[in-house]
Swiss-Prot record:
HAMAP family: ATP_synth_epsil_bac. It holds the Pfam family ATP-synt_DE. This is ATP synthase epsilon chain. NCBIfam families: ATP_synt_epsi, PRK00571.1-4. F-type ATPases have 2 components, CF(1) - the catalytic core - and CF(0) - the membrane proton channel. CF(1) has five subunits: alpha(3), beta(3), gamma(1), delta(1), epsilon(1). CF(0) has three main subunits: a, b and c. Keywords: ATP synthesis, Cell inner membrane, Cell membrane, CF(1), Hydrogen ion transport, Ion transport, Membrane, Transport. Produces ATP from ADP in the presence of a proton gradient across the membrane. One of its GO terms (molecular function) is proton-transporting ATP synthase activity, rotational mechanism. The keyword Transmembrane does not apply. InterPro entries: ATP_F1_dsu/esu_C_sf, ATP_synth_F1_dsu/esu, ATP_synth_F1_dsu/esu_N, ATP_synth_F1_esu_C, ATPsynth_dsu/esu_N. The keyword Membrane applies. It is a peripheral membrane protein. One of its GO terms (cellular component) is plasma membrane.
Amino acid sequence: MADTSFHLKVVSAEKHLYDGEVKHIQVTGSEGELGIYPQHTPLLTAIKPGMVRVVKTSGEEEFIYLSGGILEVQPTGVIVLADTAIRGRDLDEAKALESKRKAEEHIQSSHGDVDYAQASAELAKAIAKLRVIELTRR
């Protein structure tokens, strides 16, 4: 089974969200989308706001929202250390839509680089949450 799966842990400051065997995962790294499969080369990279798509050994998919963090791939398994991590089914669509609206308003009214950068980061997080909600409903 070691050739067809690997151990994944997804943890945030608040809690452990996932701890088990998976076929593969997909996550948004600092340089783009990453697909991690069994026997992947060791890697340490930053994670952008987005999601981790977990494909369990049963073939079932689970989507987890990540606000950012670190991905560590080792021969013994993979660890996602997230700033914030929320299961797709636990996300609140109304709150995500409101966050998106507020961030868009902030971008329109921003007067400096710092305001714009912060609003852009908040917009990216809101869009990522909405994407996870959409994928979870499939």
